[in-house]
Regions:
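Anionic-ligand binding region
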Residues: 134-191
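Conserved functional loop/turn residues at catalytic and ligand-binding sites
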Residues: 14, 28-31, 67, 83, ...
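An extracytoplasmic/periplasmic, membrane-proximal ligand-sensing/linker region
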Residues: 119-120, 159, 206-267
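Glycine-rich beta-alpha junction loops
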Residues: 40, 104, 152-153, 169-172, ...
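Hinge/capping helix and adjacent helix->loop/strand transition within the periplasmic-binding protein
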Residues: 26-32, 39, 47-134, 182-183, ...
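N-terminal (or domain-start) structured segment
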Residues: 1-58, 97, 121-150, 157, ...
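Hydrophobic alpha-helical segments typical of transmembrane helices
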Residues: 20, 44, 83, 112, ...
Length: 267
């Protein structure tokens, strides 16, 4: 999309995690080298790692959101829980009886689950997995009562009827599942989502940031692009530089507090 807008090729270098963020941090602040930052690299890692070699707020300028990745609280199709209310009522009645799996360790899924426990004031035993596949397998096998994972990871199993969605973690309902209530409808203000977007090295001229932000918005406004994003279990993020920057800063603070409350540390 941006290649067409700019009339020249955009070269993508895959450098996941910390190496990618360091390369982005050390690039010239001229707008020619951008980084696709995520909730993991920009907000969750700073919350759980004490010795990162970059600082989200000090080293990067936010350009534009790309996509929001909803998380879903699900139960197996044979679970007695038909709704989020059923789950909360049962968990409050018998604290510590039920467990909740996370499709990852010290990641957005993990922190979203811990944030939910805090909002709902429930005692659920957290069980971490190395990835979504193992977590879903244990949910279907009855080893865990519940699971927090991305919409993308759970949607095929929801459509097949093997697992039952109880609530979604976005502030508003999502087009992929318009009948699925949000957690926020029961616990106002709750939001626990993954996300990704463009960032530049700090010091990039504001005029350059504004131009790239405007061009990114045009790309995301294309119905075909939005459909492609939706098909991947995400929602297009139309927030520009200022609004997305405010959101990311708030996420850094929110996840740091959630990790502190849950005593989560990766190092």
């Amino acid at each position: 999309g941006l290649s067409r807008s700019w009339g020249h090729q955009v070269v993508v270098e895959n450098r996941p995690g910390v190496p990618g963020m360091m390369a982005g941090k050390e690039a010239l602040p001229d707008g020619y080298t951008l980084t696709f930052g995520t909730s993991g690299t920009l907000a969750v890692n700073p919350a759980v790692y004490s010795k990162l070699t970059y600082d989200t707020q000090r080293d990067f300028a936010m350009i534009h959101g790309g996509g929001v990745i909803p998380m879903v609280i699900v139960a197996s199709a044979t679970s007695p829980f038909q709704s989020l209310k059923d789950l909360v009522d049962a968990a409050r009645k018998e604290p510590g009886k039920y467990n909740i799996g996370y499709g990852g360790v010290n990641n957005t899924q993990h922190l979203t689950g811990e944030l939910f426990k805090s909002y709902a004031k429930v005692d659920l035993v957290g069980v971490t997995y190395k990835g979504s596949a193992a977590a879903v397998t244990d949910l279907l096998g009855g080893q865990v009562s519940l699971l927090v994972d991305s919409l993308a990871a759970t949607m095929p199993h929801i459509k097949s009827g093997k697992i039952r969605p109880l609530a979604i973690s976005t502030l508003q309902r999502v087009p992929q599942m318009p009948d699925l209530p949000t957690v926020a409808e029961t616990f106002p203000g709750f939001e626990g989502v993954g996300w990704a977007g463009l960032v530049a090295p700090k010091g990039t001229p504001q005029a350059v940031i504004d131009k790239i932000s405007e061009d990114t918005r045009k790309v995301l406004s294309d119905p075909k692009m939005r459909d492609m994003i939706m098909d991947r279990g995400m929602v297009a993020d139309m927030r520009g530089a200022r609004e997305w920057g405010e959101f990311v800063n708030a996420e850094v603070v929110k996840w740091a507090e959630a990790a502190r409350k849950a005593n989560l540390k990766a190092d």
